[in-house]
């Protein structure tokens, strides 16, 4: 029997990239019976799919499971991110039980992928360069792990791409500021692949993480948020 919860939050699956832990995500989707499913951006990696098409059957199975949620009455809210920004052409469109938004407020919770407040991603050409390099690094990581190399090249590369821009941005504070502007006391985002649950300036800040390295997600039930790892 699936566990009933009020809301399930997932971000940064990156279907279309190598190394996505799709099987584990499917297990999570089978485990819970939420009233709401919030997909907080970069579920599909449109950037990489434009460059070269990489798709596995398990990726299709993830999409099918999300559609089955919608068919069975779960309200699916899809927040577009920078890697699936093509969906921003369909903002506000209601596809049955699936809605597409740029950002969303649920109760007192501000929900955003977060790319709109990241100075690096605003320079799209550099973000694309980083994405391609990151995808390649994930492939190299998998090879290195087989021979016992533990350090993550993909994490190192992602940090270096961010540092390459001589522009310091406080991602978390930006999101907290946006939550305050909307009179919300909580913000949930993704984008930076860093799961987090903490208080910043009296605002609860949560980040879903990702499904390449952390396999993390957030559940909301009885007024409480919890980050889980698969």
Where on the chain are the PLM-derived regions?
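Short, Lys/Arg-enriched, disordered terminal segments
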Residues: 1-5, 228-230
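Core catalytic region of metal-dependent phosphoesterases/phosphodiesterases
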Residues: 3-5, 17-106
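Active-site neighborhood of phospho(di)ester-bond hydrolases with catalytic His/Asp-centered motifs
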Residues: 10-11, 37-41, 75-82, 111-112, ...
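Short active-site segment of divalent metal-dependent hydrolases/proteases
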Residues: 15, 44-45, 116, 194
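Active-site-proximal loop/helix segment associated with metal-binding centers of metalloenzymes
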Residues: 112-171
């Amino acid at each position: 029997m699936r566990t009933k919860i009020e809301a399930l939050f997932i971000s940064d699956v990156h279907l279309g990239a190598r190394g996505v832990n799709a099987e584990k995500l499917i297990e999570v989707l089978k485990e819970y019976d939420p009233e709401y499913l919030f997909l907080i951006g970069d579920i599909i990696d449109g950037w990489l799919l434009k460059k070269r098409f990489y798709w596995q059957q398990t990726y299709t199975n993830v999409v099918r499971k999300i559609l089955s949620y919608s068919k069975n009455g779960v309200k699916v809210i899809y927040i577009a991110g920078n890697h699936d920004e093509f969906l921003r052409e369909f903002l506000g469109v209601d596809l049955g039980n699936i809605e597409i938004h740029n950002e969303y407020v649920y109760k007192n919770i501000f929900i955003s992928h977060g790319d709109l407040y990241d100075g690096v991603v605003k320079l799209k050409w550099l973000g694309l360069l980083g994405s391609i390099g990151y995808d390649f690094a994930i492939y190299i990581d998998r090879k290195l792990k087989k021979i016992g190399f533990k350090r993550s090249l993909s994490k190192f590369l992602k940090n270096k791409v961010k540092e390459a821009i001589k522009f310091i941005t406080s991602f978390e504070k930006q999101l907290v500021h946006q939550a305050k502007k909307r009179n919300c006391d909580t913000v949930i985002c993704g984008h930076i692949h860093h799961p987090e649950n903490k208080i910043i300036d009296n605002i609860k800040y949560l980040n879903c993480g990702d499904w390449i390295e952390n396999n993390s997600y957030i559940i909301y039930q009885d007024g409480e948020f919890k980050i889980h790892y698969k």
